[in-house]
């Protein structure tokens, strides 16, 4: 701990990786259902997008993101292993893009204001893996592998969240890797 510069108590658990842009760190976590004692009701699930000052470790802002659609139960093969905050955010320096599983892909400005949120499906695989895909940015598009939720890979316009195109086998997949 002698090299530890700062430490911040988060509002919940998470398996996503933090990202850094200039002097800010962005990360996701979740609280309520499936957190801590692993009890509670699915209606209590809350995701959080947290912005931290990289120099001081102080929270700059937080967004609480209540699911818009029911998520997989905290059981099965995937969700108990990684929880409800496995997707790593992405940024282009103008917005933060966060995959919220069955609640879709959302964009926030760097001050935490929600710009848009777009559904990409709400299905579940038989094994209930849960979601772990992370958005990828290229040019004017943000990509998400939503094979669990929407049976497709989606490209959305960064500016407004409208779906530019989608491709997929129209079948469930076991893993969610996206390569660009």
Regions found by a protein language model. Name each.
Residues 1-180:
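Noncatalytic, solvent-exposed loop/strand surfaces
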